[in-house]
Amino acid sequence: MTFEEKLSKIYNEIANEISSMIPVEWEKVYTMAYIDDGGGEVFFNYTKPGSDDLNYYTNIPKEYNISVQVFDDLWMDLYDLFEELRDLFKEEDLEPWTSCEFDFTREGELKVSFDYIDWINSEFGQIGRQNYYKYRKFGILPETEYEINKVKEIEQYIKELEE
């Protein structure tokens, strides 16, 4: 199998896994994975047909009366797929990404992008990264001044890395 074929296979598996985690009809999914050799995180938001409201994945068990244990197992399967995707880059002697944005629609549109920022060795934690992502992706600023300032710090940090 070529690298592109392997990518396509994993992309399909990721999209199918996320789709299976959402127990209602959905329109768009916005996924972010931060992974390095020491671990990481994966989270996603989705929209429902006719609405632009973002639904955060951790609300699914409570909203739809789904076992937290079952949902956590599905989430671990999803995390493992993103690790597999990252390992594929290593196998091909490509630089392993540290973040992957994975967006797709019900109609089958897919947009995947990778970044190589060393988040783990930065001063920015999980909440800061998630707030920055929501701001960059959706224009949503966090509620507290402290969190807003963290988003601005991350923005500055990334600008400096790009120079």
From Swiss-Prot:
Designated name of the protein: Type VII secretion system protein EsaG
GO cellular component, one term: cytoplasm
Protein's UniProt keywords contain tRNA-binding: no
Alphabetized UniProt keyword annotations: Cytoplasm, Virulence
Keyword Cytoplasm belongs to the record: yes
Annotated organism of origin: Staphylococcus aureus (strain NCTC 8325 / PS 47)
Compartments reported by the entry: Cytoplasm
Function field: Component of the type VII secretion system (Ess). Also acts as part of toxin-antitoxin system. Counteracts the toxic effect of EssD via direct interaction.
Pfam family, one: YezG-like
Subunit text: Interacts with EssD (via C-terminus). Interacts with EssE.
InterPro entries in UniProt: YezG-like (IPR006728), YezG-like_sf (IPR036170)
